[in-house]
Amino acid sequence: MKPSVILYKKVADDLRARLDQHFTVTELDAFPALDHPALATAEGIIGSGGKVDKDFLQHAPRLRAASTISVGYDTFNVDALNEKGVILMHTPTVLTETVADTVLALMLASARRVVEVVERVKAGEWKGGVGSDWFGTDVHHKTIGILGMGRIGLAVAQRAHFGFSMPVLYNARRHHAEAEERFNARHCDLDTLLAESDFLCITLPLTAETHHLIGREQLAKMKPSAILINIGRGAVVDEDALTEALVKGTIQAAGLDVFVKEPLPVDSPLLDLPNVVALPHIGSATHETRYDMAACAVDNLIAALSGQVKENCVNPQVLK
């Protein structure tokens, strides 16, 4: 008899067929849907979004594996999963290059004021030669500081070093030999990173240690010409402090793909600022990469429920 699983995000037809080959699949339009009878027999879940916590696990007593179509897993209570022995799988490898491309897009858009200038053109303000009030700042040869040198940080460093001849600084728990050898990256403490970076690129996940890691005190240590880029998690940055810094000119601009509350409320003060480029958390949102993420998540669930896990496991201790 096939294991029962819950699918809570639509996937391509071929991927759905693969799930059907291995499992008895119940597809939910809403999740977590605690009152749905499929939870009682589900051994696996696959999708993205929705909270998986102790309450959910009480309604899914047979759950053995959860496969999220994402790198981030902050919607999962990992401690609760560990207590129940539930394997949590994610997709950390397939979106690296696409998210790194998004970082460069945010850097260029913020530095060259692309969104602001486009809106001015559409509003009919381009009536002749452009003056300095239309100017942006260069990206090439500027110093990039990367906060968190994981897969995405390394891919950003590659683009910055080879594509824009940028000196690379980084702050991480340990030295990254590949970054230092290939891109001449320099490991430094956080204060040095803040003080010397023209672009501060945040790639960190959200943890107790990284929550509001960048606040008013840290922003004050940055250059007035600096641009902050965040594609990690919104709450790594204190949004109130960031808004204040952007209004006061403590830093020049920000390019943001992640926010504390998503979708970003329409009354967020960040949306009123011309020096903010705000994206709707689309760092990995290309047709190719989203397909690859879903395919990886399907493979992950099959591996987890067949006892064949070799990679992409968030909590490998439950495998022992």
Swiss-Prot record:
Pfam families, alphabetized: 2-Hacid_dh, 2-Hacid_dh_C
Reactions that this protein is recorded to catalyse: glycolate + NADP(+) = glyoxylate + NADPH + H(+); (R)-glycerate + NAD(+) = 3-hydroxypyruvate + NADH + H(+); (R)-glycerate + NADP(+) = 3-hydroxypyruvate + NADPH + H(+)
Listed InterPro entries: D-isomer_2-hydroxyacid_DH, D-isomer_2_OHA_DH_cat_dom, D-isomer_DH_CS, D-isomer_DH_NAD-bd, Glyo/OHPyrv_Rdtase_B, NAD(P)-bd_dom_sf
Signal peptide: none
Enzyme nomenclature, EC number: 1.1.1.79, 1.1.1.81
Subcellular location: Cytoplasm
Record flagged with keyword NAD: yes
GO MF entry, a single one: hydroxypyruvate reductase (NADPH) activity
Any GO CC annotation of this UniProt entry: plasma membrane
Top class in the EC scheme: oxidoreductase
Entry annotation: catalytic residues: 233, 262, 281
Keywords: Cytoplasm, NAD, NADP, Oxidoreductase
Database matches in SUPFAM superfamilies: Formate/glycerate dehydrogenase catalytic domain-like, NAD(P)-binding Rossmann-fold domains
Record flagged with keyword NADP: yes
UniProt record similarity statement: Belongs to the D-isomer specific 2-hydroxyacid dehydrogenase family. GhrB subfamily.
Function: Catalyzes the NADPH-dependent reduction of glyoxylate and hydroxypyruvate into glycolate and glycerate, respectively.
Assembly: Homodimer.
Name the UniProt record assigns to this protein: Glyoxylate/hydroxypyruvate reductase B
Gene assigned in the entry: ghrB
